[in-house]
Amino acid sequence: MIKRVALAFSLLLSSILPATAGDVNVPVEAYKLKNGLRVILSRDNAVPVVTVYMIYDVGARSEEKGRTGFAHLFEHMMFEGSANAPKGVHNKMVESNGGVFNGSTHPDFTDYYEVIPSNKLATALWLESDRMRNLSINEENLKNQKEAVKQERRLSFDNQPYNTAIVDVWPTLMFHNWQSSHSLIGSFEDLNGATLADVSKFFKTYYAPDNAALVIVGDIQNAEAKKLIETYFGDIPSQPIPKRPDLTEPADFKAVTQVQKDPLAQVPAVILGYPGPKRRSPDYYALHMIDAILTGGDSSRFKLDLVKGKESIISYEAELGWPFASARDYRDPEPYAMFLVYKPNFTAAQIVDQAQEEIAKLQNQPVDAKELERVKTLVRAGAIKEMQSSQNRAQALAQFELADGNAELINTELDRVLAVTPAQIQAAAKKYLLPEKRAVLEIQPAPAQAPKGGN
C-alpha cells in the first residue's frame, strides 16, 4: 500500500545508509541476465534468513491521464495469483515457512519482498518469477481489487484527518507537471473505468524483466543463488523498455498559498514546501543536513525553539520527498517539505513565519561546528540502526540500481552526507528555501460533514 511518511528523520536515516564515514562495506555483486533483469546479490550469513526484493521501474508518476491509481491497483493485483500459484498460494507458501511479505507503491517505483528462511530461497524466487511471467489477470480479480483499493482509500485517506489534503491537494501546489501533481492514490472515477485490456497492457508494458531489478540480501552462497535465478527468471521474455515520463518542472516556481477545510481535523496544520535540488547533487546532501538540523531528534531547532520555546508546534514531519516517500524513492524532481501541526491559539501565518525564521538563521549564519558535529553523530547512529534490517538494505540497493544505475552507491552515500560543510548548508538554504519559492497549504478544522464514500 502507499503509506504517508510517519517520521521524516527516520526516513532520512534510511536514505543515507549505515555506519561511520569510510566504514560502509555492504557486499555487492551486480550483474544482468540476458533478458535484461538486473540482479544484485549481497551476502550476509549472520542469520539463516534471506530477503528477496523485486522492484519494478514504474510508479504513480508513470501513470497516464484517465488512469490514475493504476500503479497502486497493480500492486494489489500482484497478490491475486499467477499461472502456477493460484490466489492465496503466495501468502500460504511464505507464511507457512515462517516468512513475511508485502508490496508498496512509490512515486517512481513499485516493490515487492519476501523475508524467508534461507533454505526456502527457491520458493520465493519461484513465486516472484511466476507472477512476473504470467499473472492471473481476469475480470473477477480486477473487480475485487478495484473495491479493495477504494476501501483502502476510504479508510486510510478519505476518513483520516489531513490525508485528503495531503494526497489530493498538496501535489497540485507543489508541482506543475501533471505526472507529479495528480493524486498518487488515484480517483474512484479512473478506478471504475479501468478495463481488463487496460490492466493487461499495464502489466505487459511495465512488469518485464528488463524493467526490473532483483535483489537478494542475506544467507546465500552467490554461485548457488545465481543458478536458481537463472532457472526461474532466465527464460522470461523481455519487452521493449517503456519510455519514462517527462517530469520536468518549470524553473520559475512562484509562491502559492491555499486554505483547505478538513472536518476530520481536530487542530490546524500547515504544509510548507520548496522545489528541491537534483538527486545526488551537492545541494541534495546539504538539504539532508538542513533537515536533520531543523527536525532531527530532541535537540533539533524545531523541537527546542518551536515545540518547547514558543510552544506553538504540536508535532512535525519533514523530508526531501515528503509525504509519499523518502529521498531515495524519487527521481528528479523532489521537493523539500514539512508538515506542522500547531496549537489553535496560533495562526497559520504565524507558524509559517516561525518556520521561515528558523530557516533564515541557517541562511544568515553558518551552523556552528559543534552543533553540526552533534547532528552528524545522530545521523550516523541512526543510520547504523536503520541498516540492521536486511529489507532496508535490499531496498536501498534496488533503488540505487534503478535510479542511479549503480547499487554500489550504498557504500558511499553516507560519506557524502557527512562531508557536508557549514558553507554548503548556508548556500543551499539561501538557494532553495526562499519564501518567494514556497508552496503553503493551510489545513483548517471545519464543521463535521457526512463521511466520504465514493463507489
Q: Which positions does each model-derived feature cover?
A:
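Positively charged n-region of N-terminal signal peptides that target proteins for export
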Residues: 1-4
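Bacterial N-terminal signal peptides
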Residues: 6-16
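Non-catalytic beta-strand/loop surface segments
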Residues: 19-60, 86-120, 156-211, 235-281, ...
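Short pre-active-site segment immediately N-terminal to the catalytic Zn-binding motif
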Residues: 59-67
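Short, polar/flexible loop-turn hinges at active-site or ligand-entry regions and domain interfaces
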Residues: 80-84, 132-141, 367
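Short amphipathic alpha-helices in soluble, non-transmembrane regions
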Residues: 126-131, 227-232, 351-357
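Non-catalytic, conformational "gating/processing" segments within enzyme and secreted inhibitor domains
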Residues: 139, 146, 154-155, 200-232, ...
